[in-house]
Amino acid sequence: MASLATLVLDLDGTIVDSLPDLTAALNRLMTARGLAGFPAPSVAAMVGDGTTKLVERAFAARSGQARHGDIDAFVADYTAHATEATRAYPGVEDTLGRLKASGWQFAICTNKTVAATHAVLDALGLADWFAALGCGDTFPVRKPNPAHLLGTLDAAGGDPRRAVMVGDHANDIAVARGAGMPSIFAAWGYGAPSMAEGASAVAERFAALATLGPKLLT
C-alpha cells in the first residue's frame, strides 16, 4: 500500500506565532544581564537556527558574549512561559483537516527543543495532528542538514517522494532541497521575502497549503 502523502512543517513562524513569548523571554535574560532588550521585529530576524544561535546573536548585537549558563537559563525560562501569548495562525486546524481528509499526514521539523515544542503543541491542542516531531535536539543534526528532515519523515513513516516541506526560513527551503523534496515558503512567517529563493512555491496564508501541497505532488 502506498504511503500517505506527508506535509512536514516548521513550527515557529509557520504553524504558530511564538514571537511574543520568544521576545519576552529573551528580554528577561537581557535585563538580568544588564543589557537592553529588543523589539519583536529584531528578535524575528534572529530566530530560525535554534536557541543557542538566538541567544548568541542577541548578545553579539549588544557587543557582548553569552556566558556559561545563559543558554540554559533562556531555555528554562522560555519553556516555562512558552504559551502565554503564542497562538496558532488562522486556518491551521481547518487546513490540516482538509488535507487529512484527502489522504495526507503531518510532521514537524523544527530547530526548537523537544520540551518547548511539546509545551506549545499541548497548550494549543495541536499535538494529535502530527505523526512525528523532529526537534532541534531529536537528532545529532539540525536544519538545514537534510538528515534532520529525512529522519523526521522516516519517523512518520513517510516517503520523500510523497512529501512537501513548509517553512518561513531559508533553512526550511535548504533542508528540503538537500532532501530532494519540494518546498513551500510560508510568507506569513518571520523570514524576509528573499528567503523564499529556491522554494517550489510561496504561500501567503496557511489555508493556501490545502491546494499548493497536492499540486506539488502531481
Language-model segment annotations:
Residues 2-94, 113:
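N-terminal helical cap/lid subdomain that shapes the substrate entry/recognition surface
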